[in-house]
Amino acid sequence: MAGHSQFKNIMHRKGRQDAQKSKLFSKLAREITVAAKLGTPDPAMNARLRSAIIAARQENMPKDNIERAIKKAIGSDGENYDEIRYEGYGPGGVAVIVEALTDNRNRAASDIRSYFTKSGGNLGETGSVAFMFDRTGIIEFDAKVASADDMLDAAIEAGADDVLSSDSGHEVYASQDSFREVAKALEQKFGEARKAALTWKPQNTVPVDDETGEKLLKLIDLLQEHDDVQNVYANFEVSDALMAKMGG
């Protein structure tokens, strides 16, 4: 399994683990509120807010919930969330990045540190593992919107760095600086993307045995279940058999 596939599997597990829609909607709403508060409540003028709304729509979040989250940012009585990135090493020395939005820094740090420690890993300082990842933009489209060749041609013309096409869809990667422009150009050609967001893409992935892989997947599950955690990224590869066993 390639590192790219591992990234997809982690996201798939996130969807499975967040089967409780109330928890998932809460996380999506939090990102929408923060994005609207940091920028403008108009998604046409706020790329981060637009990305958050796209993610919410993909999970069938009701329109009323989305609008309520935006209005919450405009009001003066809404919660204030801090954006925090945690970095550390999981079992087997695998690099892990955790993105969180929290209204209690001490609680979040304590919880996340305990998850790493209990799994046999350790939470490090900011910057301790980020150098092993590239901060990049990802734009996803359904496979039916274009052939692999047409998507590749359009992506190159738009200034993208890489394209991965399969039966499950097209994934276009672009630098952090050009991401918004690439997404806009492709959406003008193919319609709204099913995902458009900044991500941490591992530069290389580390193969791990099933025992270590199981510990890592359990750590990721714990992290993703935490109310404050928005995204988890890691640079490891596991066997398809283990993913099937763990329900990924």
From Swiss-Prot:
Protein localization: Cytoplasm
Q: Keywords for this entry?
A: Cytoplasm, DNA-binding, Transcription, Transcription regulation
Gene Ontology MF terms: DNA binding
Keyword match Transcription: yes
According to the record, the residues making up region (Disordered) are 1-21
One annotated Gene Ontology cellular component of this protein: cytosol
Q: Which InterPro entries match?
A: Integrase-like_N, TACO1_YebC-like_2nd/3rd_dom, TACO1_YebC_N, Transcrip_reg_TACO1-like, Transcrip_reg_TACO1-like_dom3, YebC-like
The Gene Ontology biological process terms listed for this entry are: regulation of DNA-templated transcription
Q: Which family does it belong to?
A: Belongs to the TACO1 family.
Q: What is the protein named?
A: Probable transcriptional regulatory protein RPC_4807
Q: Which organism is it from?
A: Rhodopseudomonas palustris (strain BisB18)
